[in-house]
Amino acid sequence: MAAIHSKDTKPEMIVRRGLWARGFRYRLNHKRLPGHADLVLRKYRTCIFVNGCFWHGHNVTESQVQGSGFKVQGSECCKIPKTNREFWVAKIRRNKERDREEQKKLAAMGWHCITVWECELTPKKREETLEAIAFTLNHIYLQDRRCKTDDVRRERDEEPMALPMAAEEESCF
């Protein structure tokens, strides 16, 4: 498994080129955030994870079978090997659990997470996926900014505090 690259993979490069061409600027593999996201867009407070379908168990289903525990079924894009199956099932399960934990930590820190799957970047689906990412990023940006401007607007529209008056209406001398 030492030959498996975690940075600069082909799916990651497709997403990077697509976002750059659409005007989005990002940092790569930010070390200070949990999970080491593939792309970090600080302006949008968003982390993008480009996951390989096999390594992260895309659409892998686990169902409980009476007596024997769990039955794991692969998907179209994630086929679990038949040899040494228990090892691969445990590895994929750990990867999925780690991904969930990292995304929870990022959400607690106020970051948004987008997961892009390798199978979504096939030539037939590529443009649609990249447009969906761009739409989601713009939506996040507008939602975050609207919340801040709404807070400012509410503060401005609140009743002014009772200020002391320089001259009283009625005076008794």
Each language-model region and where it sits:
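Nucleic-acid endo/exonuclease domains
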Residues: 1-64, 70-115, 119-152, 156-173
